Amino acid sequence: MRSYLDFEKPVAELEAKLEELRALGARDGAVAISDDVSRLESKAAAALAELYATLTPWQKTQVARHPQRPHFVDYCAGLIEEFTPLAGDRSFGEDEAVVGGFGRFRGRPVCVIGQEKGATTEARIRHNFGMARPEGYRKAVRLMELAGRFGLPVLTFVDTAGAYPGIEAEERGQAEAIARSTEACLALGTPNVALVIGEGGSGGAIALATANRVLMLEHAIYSVISPEGAASILWRDAGRAQDAATAMKITAQDLLRLGVIDGIVPEPTGGAHREPEAAIRAAGDALAEALTGLADLDADALREQRAQKFLEIGRRL
């Protein structure tokens, strides 16, 4: 069953009427309703397109968090052949908030790493809602070092509200683990491309997104803190999250204009959750194009391009 966001209520009502008409036609084939169905389909599609063409930053935040939005495991299943996952950080344990391994992307061997939120209650608990602990980032470092050793490109998929802030994570060196993961990204001698597929929250996101090319899905968000967190700090009122989302410039469109990201991957009308397969194909095309654009750079040039890219962001902003 499709899940609707609050601001999608007008579309939800139209699509509910459409389903009623279709059910009526299925029950009684003698009832001529094809014209009514076509008319209502066109009206619902137009309403959806108009709504999604003018989303506010807060509405985009809601879309980025949509429970039916495709997650990393969906992109991995749709894009990576012969995927072989690796587990553990060889130091403390396994963190399923970060999933990674090796496989083939459109015929070429790659290392792929992503943050997984989980699609069911059980999966969300197992993956800790995509909030990685230190061992998750250390696993990512291990994977990136292996990729560098074997000369493989690295694809990272970012989808997290932020790194896990629990006491045990801090005791095991959360800040250091994030820093080491960021350092590993910068030190890679092979191309790396990051794609923000949902939420890109704080250091938990940048630890996997310090890449030669950083892309975002059309309705993804990328920020140093959640809108609710920013509103609580700035105005002592989490209820002003909508104001914070607008002020923070967290959308793909704002960040492309500011030079923080390198490209936007278009989503199907109504968001990636409405047509996951189409969204995954579009993401694959964008990743392939980015890798092709980096193919002629040697290890030193890749490191230099990456470093200058992020230094320039600091100078400009």
Curated annotation (Swiss-Prot):
Main location: cytoplasm
Its job: Component of the acetyl coenzyme A carboxylase (ACC) complex. First, biotin carboxylase catalyzes the carboxylation of biotin on its carrier protein (BCCP) and then the CO(2) group is transferred by the carboxyltransferase to acetyl-CoA to form malonyl-CoA.
Pfam families referenced in this protein's UniProt entry, alphabetically: ACCA (PF03255)
Keyword Lipid biosynthesis found: yes
GO biological process per UniProt: fatty acid biosynthetic process; malonyl-CoA biosynthetic process
Record-stated family: Belongs to the AccA family.
Subcellular location: Cytoplasm
UniProt-listed PROSITE patterns: COA_CT_CTER
Gene Ontology CC: one annotated term: acetyl-CoA carboxylase complex
Domain of life: Bacteria
Subunit structure: Acetyl-CoA carboxylase is a heterohexamer composed of biotin carboxyl carrier protein (AccB), biotin carboxylase (AccC) and two subunits each of ACCase subunit alpha (AccA) and ACCase subunit beta (AccD).
EC code: 2.1.3.15
Gene name, Swiss-Prot/TrEMBL: accA
Pathway connected to this protein: Lipid metabolism; malonyl-CoA biosynthesis; malonyl-CoA from acetyl-CoA: step 1/1
Domain CoA carboxyltransferase C-terminal: residue ranges: 39-293
Single GO MF annotation: carboxyl- or carbamoyltransferase activity
Keyword Manganese: no
Known catalytic reactions: N(6)-carboxybiotinyl-L-lysyl-[protein] + acetyl-CoA = N(6)-biotinyl-L-lysyl-[protein] + malonyl-CoA
Protein name: Acetyl-coenzyme A carboxylase carboxyl transferase subunit alpha
Keyword tags: ATP-binding, Cytoplasm, Fatty acid biosynthesis, Fatty acid metabolism, Lipid biosynthesis, Lipid metabolism, Nucleotide-binding, Transferase
